[in-house]
Curated annotation (Swiss-Prot):
Species per Swiss-Prot/TrEMBL record: Sulfurisphaera tokodaii (strain DSM 16993 / JCM 10545 / NBRC 100140 / 7)
Transmembrane in keyword set: no
The reaction(s) this protein catalyses: RNA(n) + a ribonucleoside 5'-triphosphate = RNA(n+1) + diphosphate
Cell compartment(s), UniProt: Cytoplasm
UniProt name for this protein: DNA-directed RNA polymerase subunit Rpo11
GO MF annotations, alphabetized: DNA binding; DNA-directed RNA polymerase activity; protein dimerization activity
GO terms for biological process, alphabetical: DNA-templated transcription
Record's function text: DNA-dependent RNA polymerase (RNAP) catalyzes the transcription of DNA into RNA using the four ribonucleoside triphosphates as substrates.
């Protein structure tokens, strides 16, 4: 995975994430939209044969786009850990 900044501003960030596809793009977009202060989050896959996505984040200024992305990843990690615990508890039944 390689991340390149395409555009950056106080409330806007556009990243190219090489080596990733719809799975990561959709996951990040969904969790970004749960972060307070995020006004807009989207991703696109410019070409179907190239493993690369473009992620766009816009905030209202109460949080930076980079902070919002980190928070979104932390939220995804928390939910993943909860899911792991649920799966483990199923095995014990």
């Amino acid at each position: 995975m390689e991340i390149k900044i395409l555009r950056s501003g106080e409330n806007y960030l556009e990243l190219q994430i090489d080596g990733e596809e719809h799975t990561v793009g959709n996951l990040l977009k969904g969790y970004l939209l749960k972060v307070p202060g995020v006004k807009f989050a989207s991703y696109s896959k410019p070409h179907p044969l190239i493993d690369s996505i473009i992620l766009k984040i816009m905030t209202d200024g109460s949080i930076s786009p980079k902070e919002a992305l980190v928070k979104a990843i932390e939220l995804a990690e928390e939910d993943t850990n909860k899911f792991i615990e649920e799966v483990k508890s199923i095995e014990k039944r």
